[in-house]
Each structure stands twice: as structure tokens, then as C-alpha cells.
Swiss-Prot record:
Found in heart, lung brain, spleen, kidney and to a lesser extent in liver. This is AMP deaminase 3. It comes from Mus musculus. The lineage of its organism: Eukaryota, Metazoa, Chordata, Craniata, Vertebrata. Substrate binds at residues 318, 387-392, 588, 663-666. One of its GO terms (biological process) is ADP metabolic process.
Length: 766
């Protein structure tokens, strides 16, 4: 059966939910006092009066519930369900004996569904012995039964919405979470959660071979409402009958987004999530206290493997700043010494040599220092993104940026390619470090893609230690004001139409087809703190009608990027080609609503600092195990002091975090920027070896490395969740840690499944 996008109407949206969602947007748009806006999403921890009032309300609810006969029955039912769940979550060594036949998602705690057996199956892995922390009788986390039911069902619905969007775009969704959300024991196909990345060429293969492009299909592509539709032929185009692919529906997306917006402001849900997150952090502290030495003993007995020789991926780095400042300075001096009379630019028909470029700037490269180069971010860039962007201009000269850090210039981006290749060689020499640099496509012209592919092939930039991500800066307003684009739809068309053409007719676009093998995802980048006066809704103008010079809001960009990536991925999957992940910058600054948009559309995000401000979203990101690439050193110079960065807190709670460098040229001092990031985090937060190796393992899982590479670096079963998916001989992550993470996630998910099961039992008794 063909995959289709399930549609909803605005009439399906509850009036209360719609009003709450509009209230959130209205508050954010008006830019009211930030504390007032944040109070919508947070729990009043720092306000004694607010805390007291909240406790009073909870106490009144508890007293009212005690007098209710109906509530007493439900409490009894919950206690029974909870005791069953706990009995499944406390495996004994005897329970776990047997051949490794059980499904990974059914261990150690099988979701309770009607008709399911209460006896757990045999262990699919050798269960590690360690001291577990269990709380009995904890059936609703210290809140009323009514609030617990409401919160759990709402969270489950939000996760189902996330799962729908993830599966349609071939993004990842954790199989364990899916199993708990499934009805009547539905199985979740294992391959569903695996994106298709092109495996690296074999040593004897040419990575630039253009002869393996599949045959052309001759399909036609047209844009409707900002989304590209595929048609088998001219007749189908005239009939408006598109090729059988899932095409997104804006009204459905707005309904789903409204549900999440209403959920993150719901009082009982905020309280429930806040308490569960506090519990997760405290539980990890207890786990560390009880099992730290056992974990360390596991690692010490693991031969040949330590933190230095486990694979690490820099999951968020911009290609234009992938070298450190000393590297850039050395390269500038080297080019000036070896080829000063080379023609490097042309201005008004006059050819300009490298010596003349520096003469016009009144400087001698010999006298340059890292200080005079002035590309490093410092105290003056804090909360000043405009000043930070200027740091991309060496010595403040845009001429040097165009010459050394661009792919399109008189030299065809040769200098930039040479520097990137030097960085790649350093990664290859280190053997265990990988990188995912971002290259820019702006959407000014459809020729940008062919130019970038030509740069990649002509300068032979491929490296086995690099995978490429395309970043799309959110700067439509600049292009529109300069009359470079007629509307936002044209920008989307320039970004995505060449990709559809290369997918449909690869024989006609061989260079781009080859380049796309090494591209694994898309990013959306710019200053998130920029304010937008527009509220994205079903009444927003479609991209072809967005002709104003005002920049569309963040959520508008994300929806239309996701929509086109989703259609493209389904078309490429149909052709047996690699697919792409959507990995936007999100939650670094700006509005909490950015994180709502990313929850629906993104496979993973970069930064995620604002999750700290919303317990509901933070808990949802935990339950859905959405990967977050965090860059504490970058944040320290731009938005958040290092000591206040939530990375350590997120790691302890069990969120899927990795460390990344963002911009080594601006933020780092050493040749190995990623190791510098790990070293500082380890020192400041006193992270253990197991913590560091867990973060490194997360980075490989989050990355666009192929299935074959991940099997080689993490183990044959890396895609299975829990200890069964961990090979300590390759990852150096203790099985005790993996078992703790998995059992804790299962416990949290069981709260949601218990609430759904209770509803089914209540319906049956009635």
C-alpha cells in the first residue's frame, strides 16, 4: 500500500486547544516581558509565592479526590497496573536465562497491552549485575490521578504525532518508544528507523566515478503551495494526478502544532514533566553513587579500548570555520610566500594578483598575527550575533573571506578546498575523529547546486572522515530587498528543484548525483534571536504569495523545508538512493516555539539550550530520544556562560546529547578542536570516562555515517536499543550504563502506557 500523509481539518481541533495555541503565539509575538512569556512554559521554582500557590492548588485537588468513590476505584486500578509494570521492570538473573531470541524492544520491560503475557521473555543479551533503584507505589508521581491521566495521555499523543512525521520523512524514531505506543502488540519493523546513507567507496574504488548513475525516469516536477509535486508524465500533470508519494498538508501540520503548543502550557502536564525530570536527574545521581566503581571496573577490563580510541563525530561544524585561527593564518602566509603574483580576482575587467589584494588592504601577511587576524570570538560577541558574523572576515576584510573561505570565486574555491583537505587529512591521521561540515546553499539561483558539486569533484574534497550537510541560511529578506528573488517560493524552488531533477534524471546531472552520495542532511541556520511579527498558521500566505521584504518566521522555514525533504526522501527511497535528515539549528536563542516546530519536523537539532525553559518539551525530547548536538564553548561566547550550560544536566537525565565544535576558527585554540571540547567539558563538569564514551557513542549514532560504518565502529547490533545494541569492545561504554539508560526509559514510557491501558480497562468495565 502506498505511503500517504494522513490529513486532518481545523474542525478536528478542539476549541480550547486552538485558543491556548493562539495565546502562546500572541505572547511570543508581542515580545512581552521575557519572564512573563517563559512563565507559560516553566514551573515556578524560583518564586516562593508561585510555589506556595501551586502546592495549595494540588492539596485542594488531593482532598477533593479523597472524597470521590470513582477516584478511589481508579487509584486502586492504577496501583494494580503499576505493580504489574514494575514486576516486569525488575528482571532477575533467572528470568534472563535462555537463548538470545527475544526482540530488543520487548526487554527488559514489555509494554502492557491487552492480551499480552505478564512473563518477560529470555534476555537478548547478558544482563549486567548492578544495583538498581526502584520506587514502589509510584503510580502518579505525587500528583492527582486526574492530572496524571491527562498528562500521560497528552504526552503519548504528542509522541504519536512526532512518530508520524518521523516515519513519513524516513527520520529516526526509537523503536522502544514506538513499541510502548503501539496498540495490541503491533510490531515495529526494525528497518523503519534506519535512514539510508550511501556507504563509503571501497579502497579500490574511485570516489569521483560518474559512471554509476541510474537511468533517467523523465518525471515532471511542479511546485504547488511551496511544495514540489512529482508527475509521471505530461498527461498526469494536466490531470493534476501526482506520482504516488506522501505529500504534506499544511492544515494537518497546523492542527498538530497547535496540540503541542497547548500541551507545553498545560499546568498539570508541566508539573508532571517537571517532577519526572527531577526524578531522572536524582535517579542518575543515585546510580552513579552506587555503580560508578562497577562501571569503571567494566571499562578497565576492556582490552585495547579507551576514550582516545573510540570513534567521535563532530556533529555540528561549519565548513567555513572548520580550521582553527592559527591554521588559517599559516595558510594565508604560505599562499602569499609561494604564489604572490598569481591572479586571484577580477574587478571591473581588471585582473588582480594576490600581492595586489594585500597591497589594497595596506598590509603585509608577514606581519599578521592571530590577534590582528581577528577571527576569534570574545567577550564583545556575547549576545551580539552581528559582531559574531563579522568574525568570518579575516582582518575585517570581506575580500579575504571571499578569497579563502568561499567555494565560488575567481579561483573556483581552490584555496578553501585546500584548507578543508588539510583539515580532513588531520582527521584521517587521528583515525578516530570524524566531522560533518556544513556547506551553504542560499537559494538565490538554481545553479548553486551544480557549482557546489563541481567544486567538490574538481578539487577532490572527498574524505572518508567527512560527511557533508547543506545549510540554508534564513536570509530571504536580504535577497528580496536586493530584488534577487520575486517571492519565497522561488527560493524554495532554487533549493530543492535541482535535487529532484538529479534524483529523477541522474544521467543528465551526473556531478550533482555523485555529490549527493556524500550529503547526509540539511540544516537551517541564522540568528534565532531575530524577532518575527508573523504568526505561522493556515492563513499564512503560501510561499509563492510571500512577496514582502519581511523574513518568514522560523516555523514557516522549518515546515516548508521539511515538506520538500519528505517528498524528496520518499522519491529517493523509491529509486534506491540515499536519503537526507533534517538537522536544524534550534533552541539556541529566540522563542520556545522553535523547539515545537523542530519536535515535529527535525530528525535532530543543534544547541537545544531553551529546552531548559520548558519541562514538557524537555521530557518529550527525552522520551522520543531526539538527538541534540551541543556546543558549550560556542554558547559561552554567544548566548550562555559555560557554567550555566545544561549539557551535563541533559546527559544525567538521559537525553541523547553529543558534543560538537560549531566554529573552531572562532572558539577553539588547538589543532584538535573536538578533543578540546571534550577535555574542557570533562574538567569543568568532572565527567567520567564512561560519560565521555557515552557522549562519543551518541555522536556516532546521531551522525550521517552509513549503516556499515556504524556497525564497524559501534558493533553489529548498534541499531538495537539498550545493552543489546552496545559492544563495549568498540564503544567503551559500560553495559551497566546502557542497561540503566534502557530500563529507566522503559520505566518512564510505562507510565504513559499504564494510563492508556487504564482507559481501556475503564471502557471495558463500563
Amino acid at each position: 500500500m502506498p505511503r500517504q500523509f494522513p490529513k486532518l481539518n481545523m474542525s478536528d481541533l478542539d476549541e480550547h486547544v486552538r485558543l491556548l495555541a493562539e495565546k502562546v503565539f500572541a505572547k511570543v509575538l508581542r515580545e512581552e516581558d521575557s519572564k512573563d512569556v517563559m512563565s507559560l512554559f516553566t514551573v515556578p521554582e524560583d518564586c516562593p509565592i508561585g510555589q506556595k500557590e501551586a502546592k495549595e492548588r494540588e492539596l485542594q485537588k488531593e482532598l477533593a479526590e479523597q472524597k470521590s468513590v470513582e477516584t478511589a476505584k481508579r487509584k486502586k486500578s492504577f496501583k494494580m497496573i503499576r505493580s504489574q509494570s514494575l514486576s516486569l521492570q525488575m528482571p532477575t538473573q533467572q528470568d534472563w536465562k535462555g537463548p538470545p531470541t527475544a526482540s530488543p524492544a520487548m526487554s527488559p520491560a514489555t509494554p502492557l497491552v491487552p492480551g499480552a503475557t505478564s512473563k518477560p521473555g529470555p534476555a537478548p543479551y547478558a544482563m549486567p549485575e548492578y544495583q538498581r533503584v526502584t520506587i514502589s507505589g509510584d503510580y502518579c508521581a505525587g500528583i492527582t490521578v486526574e492530572d496524571y491521566e491527562q498528562a500521560a495521555k497528552s504526552l503519548a499523543k504528542a509522541l504519536m504525532i512526532r512518530e508520524k512525521y518521523a516515519r513519513l520523512a524516513y527520520h529516526r524514531f526509537p523503536r522502544t518508544t514506538a513499541q510502548y505506543l503501539a496498540h495490541q502488540g503491533e510490531s515495529v519493523p526494525l528497518e523503519e528507523g534506519l535512514p539510508d546513507f550511501h556507504p563509503p567507496p571501497l579502497p579500490q574504488e574511485d570516489p569521483y566515478c560518474l559512471d554509476d548513475a541510474p537511468p533517467n525516469l523523465g518525471y515532471l516536477v511542479r511546485m504547488h503551495g511551496g511544495v514540489l509535486f512529482v508527475y509521471d508524465n505530461q498527461t498526469m500533470l494536466e490531470r493534476q494526478e501526482p506520482h504516488s508519494l506522501p505529500y504534506p498538508d499544511l492544515e494537518t501540520y497546523i492542527v498538530d502544532m497547535s496540540h503541542i503548543l497547548a500541551l507545553i502550557t498545560d499546568g498539570p502536564t508541566k508539573t508532571y514533566c517537571h517532577r519526572r525530570l527531577n526524578f531522572l536527574e536524582s535517579k542518575f545521581s543515585l546510580h552513579e553513587m552506587l555503580n560508578e566503581m562497577s562501571e569503571f571496573k567494566e571499562l578497565k577490563s576492556n582490552p585495547h579500548r579507551d576514550f582516545y580510541n573510540v570513534r567521535k563525530v563532530d556533529t555540528h561544524i561549519h565548513a567555513a570555520a572548520c580550521m582553527n585561527q592559527k591554521h588559517l593564518l599559516r595558510f594565508i602566509k604560505h599562499t602569499y610566500q609561494t604564489e604572490p603574483d598569481r591572479t586571484v580576482a577580477e574587478k571591473l575587467g581588471r585582473k588582480i594578483t594576490l600581492r595586489q589584494v594585500f597591497d589594497s588592504l595596506h598590509m603585509d601577511p608577514y606581519d599578521l598575527t592571530v590577534d590582528s587576524l581577528d577571527v576569534h570570538a570574545g567577550r564583545q560577541t556575547f549576545h551580539r550575533f552581528d559582531k559574531f558574523n563579522s568574525k568570518y572576515n579575516p582582518v575585517g576584510a570581506s575580500e579575504l573571506r571571499d578569497l579563502y573561505l568561499k567555494t565560488e570565486n575567481y579561483l573556483g574555491g581552490e584555496y578553501f578546498a585546500r584548507m578543508v583537505k588539510e583539515v580532513a587529512r588531520e582527521l584521517e591521521d587521528s583515525k578516530y575523529q570524524y566531522s560533518e561540515p556544513r556547506l551553504s546553499i542560499y537559494g538565490r539561483s538554481p545553479k548553486e547546486w551544480s557549482s557546489l558539486a563541481r567544486w567538490f569533484i574538481q578539487h577532490k574534497v572527498y574524505s572518508p572522515n567527512m560527511r557533508w550537510i547543506i545549510q540554508v541560511p534564513r536570509i530571504y529578506d536580504i535577497f528580496r530587498s536586493k530584488k534577487l528573488l520575486p517571492n519565497f517560493g522561488k527560493m524554495l524552488e532554487n533549493i530543492f528543484l535541482p535535487l529532484f531533477k538529479a534524483t529523477i534524471n541522474p544521467q543528465d546531472h551526473r556531478e550533482l548525483h555523485l555529490f549527493l552520495k556524500y550529503v547526509t542532511g540539511f540544516d537551517s541556520v541564522d540568528d534565532e534571536s531575530k524577532h518575527s511579527d508573523h504568526m505561522f498558521s493556515d492563513k499564512s500566505p503560501s510561499p509563492d504569495l510571500w512577496t514582502s521584504e519581511q523574513n518568514p518566521p522560523y516555523s514557516y522555514y522549518l515546515y516548508y523545508m521539511y515538506a520538500n525533504i519528505m517528498v524528496l526522501n520518499n522519491l529517493r527511497r523509491e529509486r534506491g538512493l540515499s536519503t537526507f535528515l533534517f538537522r536544524p539549528h534550534c533552541g539556541e536563542a529566540g522563542s520556545i516555539t522553535h523547539l515545537v516546530s523542530a519536535f515535529l519536523t527535525a530528525d535532530n537539532i543543534s544547541h537545544g539550550l531553551l529546552l531548559k525553559k520548558s519541562p514538557v518539551l524537555q521530557y518529550l525530547y527525552y522520551l522520543a530520544q531526539i538527538p541534540i548536538a551541543m556546543s558549550p564553548l560556542s554558547n559561552n561566547s554567544l548566548f550562555l556562560e559555560y557554567s550555566k550550560n545544561p549539557l551535563r544536566e541533559f546527559l544525567h537525565k538521559g537525553l541523547h546529547v553529543s558534543l560538537s565544535t560549531d566554529d573552531p576558527m572562532q572558539f577553539h585554540y588547538t589543532k584538535e578542536a573536538l578533543m578540546e571540547e571534550y577535555a574542557i567539558a570533562a574538567q569543568v563538569w568532572k565527567l567520567s570516562t564512561c560519560d565521555l564514551c557515552e557522549i562519543a557513542r551518541n555522536s556516532v549514532l546521531q551522525s550521517g555515517l552509513s549503516h556499515q560504518e556504524k556497525q564497524k565502529f559501534l558493533g553489529q547490533n548498534y541499531y538495537k536499543e539498550g545493552p543489546e545494541g552496545n559492544d563495549i569492545r568498540k564503544t567503551n561504554v559500560a553495559q551497566i550504563r546502557m542497561a540503566f539508560r534502557y530500563e529507566t526509559l522503559c520505566n518512564e514510557l510505562s507510565f504513559l502506557s499504564d494510563a492508556m491501558k487504564s482507559e481501556e480497562i475503564t471502557a471495558l468495565t463500563k
